[in-house]
From Swiss-Prot:
Pfam families: Ank, Ank_2. This is Ankyrin repeat and death domain-containing protein 1A. Disulfide bonds: none annotated. ANK repeats lie at residues 14-43, 47-76, 90-119, 123-152, 158-187, 191-220, 224-253, 257-286, 290-319, 323-352, 356-385. Residues 413-501 form the Death domain.
Amino acid sequence: MQEELAWETDGLLPLERQLHEAARQNNVGRMQELIGRRVNTRARNHVGRVALHWAAGAGHEQAVRLLLEHEAAVDEEDAVGALTEARLCFGMNALLLSAWFGHLRILQILVNSGAKIHCESKDGLTLLHCAAQKGHVPVLAFIMEDLEDVALDHVDKLGRTAFHRAAEHGQLDALDFLVGSGCDHNVKDKEGNTALHLAAGRGHMAVLQRLVDIGLDLEEQNAEGLTALHSAAGGSHPDCVQLLLRAGSTVNALTQKNLSCLHYAALSGSEDVSRVLIHAGGCANVVDHQGASPLHLAVRHNFPALVRLLINSDSDVNAVDNRQQTPLHLAAEHAWQDIADMLLIAGVDLNLRDKQGKTALAVAVRSNHVSLVDMIIKADRFYRWEKDHPSDPSGKSLSFKQDHRQETQQLRSVLWRLASRYLQPREWKKLAYSWEFTEAHVDAIEQQWTGTRSYQEHGHRMLLIWLHGVATAGENPSKALFEGLVAIGRRDLAGWSTMARSQLTATSASRVQMILVPQPPE
């Protein structure tokens, strides 16, 4: 519900609508005029509300008294029968509305007029629930001190007491009043949540601190096995997470499904919460009931910043879930290029296969994610080269993503002319094999179909992949290209190669490396 009732007048006759409006605005003179014309004081709009609801919800004492004097039914609820629209109605009567909005004097008038004090909304909210949720301490005091047989720990349809409601909605003063009145601190709702779970999940620091001070059990689990720390992590509340950790919460507590607090932080994408948990000793490599690590979840839900944090925190990039999928398999399946680049730079094993026997490269091919296919091939070629050159300095800023920058346009144009005008349909593959592309690499490139001239695109992609490797190795691209063409028997292209050499050589090997390998973001 909102801080005031949403104005609804459908389903009313014109004069009835005017009565509702006058009650809402406390226009007693107009109300008396309309009542004198025998306008029905019990007329309902299309969501079941009567004039008394508007007057009580707005705290208009004169309007309430006038309506009660003219046959307004004190206990009428909205959302009655066929009029019910769950989106708009809550099964609230005037008494509950006065408690909800904190109008103590209206509450007293209605009680003195015979309103039933043990009423409930359709969600099972009592007067105590309404006042506690909205933090109206004077109303709470009246209910507890002046009304008879009020059950302090009565539960609503979710199994929550007024104490739960105050905690869930951050009402510290109301919470203190209920504690002082002797409420049960440890009661659980139907999902097994304590007040600690609810306050932590909503991020209410002051209430959470008070509950910790009261002595609620930090390790109490709900029906799914979540502790309050899980709730705070899942709600992306780093301050609450820190508070609970300082109070002694177990950072690596597991739910029934083996989910850690770090899993919940990963599901919500919270880098801040994850960092707090990791610094407190949270294990980055624990797996849930499906074999998924926090890194798997961060990849699946496309949280690049969190993926970077987890990788830097020694998460196992080669961990496999119950489907034998690594995080890279997931990135390949969804075409998350930024995340795939991080995993490739981290050195993920490209030979691991899922339950269908597919590598991450095969998954990318099956999903027709061309750019990601090329990234994986670049990475595979780089790590093969690196294995054979262990003494080479590794001070290169790696990236395997496709480069679209203006600085590389000339180079890419040269290679496109070669692929589209000079190489015959099968020659790009001969050139690829001469440069030690594997059969799997060639097959992966060839899966793309753009028509009868697909070979031109295949050749262009292969040349760009090759150029990435040449740049990374610090080799002379013009020399390597010339030697490759000679190796496949295309010495006749020497003239073209010589022409292109001036364009390629104009950019030194070191310059090629710099512009082909984008710098990582700061």
